[in-house]
Amino acid sequence: MTEPTGEHDRGAPRRQDDAFEWLVDEPMLHEPILVVMLTGWIDAAGAADAAADTLSKECETSPILRFDDDTFIDFRARRPVMELRDGVNTDLVWSTIELRAGRSSSGRDILVLTGPEPDMAWHRFARLISDIAVDLGVTKMIAFGAYPFAAPHTRTPRLSCSSPSTDVLANVTFARSSVDVPAGMA
């Protein structure tokens, strides 16, 4: 995270909600980009999750906000993973959705939202993400996903993009498609 340098820097957000918890006092960010990768529906072969993990490591992100798991995750459908070693329960890992902050090698502040796609309260979750993004001064949001596509492994994978903005699409050279599919959270 960067030191404050101008009018677009954002200090400690004051938004509070019982659906999330701030893990830091003052995340100082300058016009960050928000990258969203929620595992679940749209992540063929775990490609998008691997991309988000790589980005998080390269930008040396650390958690700044954690969502309340009981509010958004159905643990009957997404059970915690119990680690057993020689019959001893050594750990219990719960799914969690968190927002991490870091900086790219070019000095750009990056926010990475990771975890499982919410099982419930999608409208509330979307509003919270939108409000938090505004509070933190986010200038752009990018969602990672990977659709399954029948293509030989000998071919270069195709990248595609979608956006609610025709202005954004005018500035990218990725393939565009027309299709009706079940939507993911991101």
Model-assigned labels for residue ranges:
Residues 2-115:
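N-terminal short beta-loop-beta anion/metal-coordinating cradle
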Residues 38-42, 112-122, 172-182:
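Flexible, glycine/proline-enriched loop segments at strand-loop-helix junctions
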Residues 44, 119-123, 148-154:
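Short, well-ordered, mixed-charge alpha-helical segments that flank or form enzyme active sites
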